[in-house]
Amino acid sequence: MAFLKKSLFLVLFLGLVSLSICEEEKRENKDEIEQEDDEQSEEKRALWKDILKNVGKAAGKAVLNTVTDMVNQGEQ
């Protein structure tokens, strides 16, 4: 009977250890996926920042040219 108890405890212990290892791997995979998502969102933010910066420059130049033309026409 004692032999069966020891065997049962050994099986349960090994099962818990393998379950623990699987859970740890799941957490690591989840963390890696979240990190990749964070990196992608940072890249998107940087891209939008560049786009908005270029649009702002173009709009500023257009306004400056329009105002300059209006001033030049007023002087003539």
Swiss-Prot record:
Tissue expression from the record: Expressed by the skin glands.
Chain positions found as Glutamine amide: Q73
GO cellular component term of the entry, any: extracellular region
Transmembrane feature ranges: none
UniProt key word Secreted: yes
GO biological process terms on file: defense response to bacterium; innate immune response
Signal peptide range in chain numbering: 1-22
Keywords, sorted A to Z: Amidation, Amphibian defense peptide, Antibiotic, Antimicrobial, Cleavage on pair of basic residues, Immunity, Innate immunity, Secreted, Signal
Proregion positions: 23-43, 75-76
InterPro entries for this protein: Dermaseptin_dom, Frog_antimicrobial_propeptide, FSAP
Superkingdom of the organism of origin: Eukaryota
Subcellular localization(s) per the UniProt record: Secreted
Chief place of localization: secreted
Function according to Swiss-Prot or TrEMBL: Potent antimicrobial peptide with potent activity against Gram-positive and Gram-negative bacteria. Probably acts by disturbing membrane functions with its amphipathic structure. Has an activity of stimulation of insulin release, which may protect the species from being eaten by predators by causing fatal hypoglycemia. Has hemolytic activity.
Other facts: The primary structure of this peptide is identical to that of Insulin-releasing peptide from Phyllomedusa trinitatis (AC C0HLC4), and Dermaseptin-2 from P.tarsius (AC P84922).
Record-stated family: Belongs to the frog skin active peptide (FSAP) family. Dermaseptin subfamily.
Designated name of the protein: Dermaseptin-B4
Natural source organism: Phyllomedusa bicolor
